[in-house]
């Protein structure tokens, strides 16, 4: 059975605190008619620190889309190998044992995808399949896990490497002065992550079922306007209330699996902002403690897009992991409005090969019943 192993996380060395963010907002937007509202909204995020791929002075000085994308490519090639090596070590796998690389990022563009460079530069086989995901935004972390799960169900002896590279600060647009844009300037951070999904064995979350849901007629709630100056992030004021629509999706998937949300042991969800976590507590009738890892990611890193779920999961591992067979859920939320959800149980020690194959045969026989 496919197991999501311990993620590797990296953040850039340049740090900006909430106080520095507030001071910059006061100075930069001194005459803005809604400046005080923006300052309150930034404070309410609870984001205390964020990491940036460039010093704040370079981040604020927009050099143009071409230069920014060059920075994206150079920094990705500099920083990705280290998290890939650590993720492989965490899963006790070698590059030659990886059959698919899923690369997720919504903050820069490359063609060919960085997957080609990773394969050529880090000892992966030329036959390694590539799956770049560029347009699912913050939902892409959950989507990557689910597509890796699907692949391992189809090819039970395979291993999948997931890589997330998000330099959100490269999307800063000084001319965007709407309340939503100014709030985003104090919310998003930069990070990289990688994790291996093993088809057999491994310690971590055994992936048992996954599902996807698109909220109808909400595609303009979270979007990019692509202009000469790059990606302009657009956030509708209705976005903070989306958990009222998505919480039932989580409940339904868990119920379909024969489990009950109140009896589950851990939750790793995309912490796009504090309202998401607060509303999930309310609509799922769960105590705030159940989302402590996602909350810590938001507080210490900000919204790091598709890397959020991996950073939060790494915190669960750092805390000793969960008990054997503990029941858990991972969910990513993003543009669409899209939810990508996975449920599974914790494996303290890797399953034996024979047992794993038996479970995989059960998955293939059951089809939807086990894989979403």
UniProtKB/Swiss-Prot annotation:
Homodimer. The active site is at residue 138. Keywords: Acyltransferase, Melanin biosynthesis, Transferase. Belongs to the thiolase-like superfamily. Chalcone/stilbene synthases family. This is 1,3,6,8-tetrahydroxynaphthalene synthase. It holds the Pfam family Chal_sti_synt_N. GO terms for molecular function: acyltransferase activity, transferring groups other than amino-acyl groups. Disruption phenotype: Cells lacking this gene are unable to produce melanin in hyphae, resulting in albino mycelium, however there is no effect on growth or morphological development. The keyword Acyltransferase applies. The keyword Zinc does not apply. It comes from Streptomyces griseus.
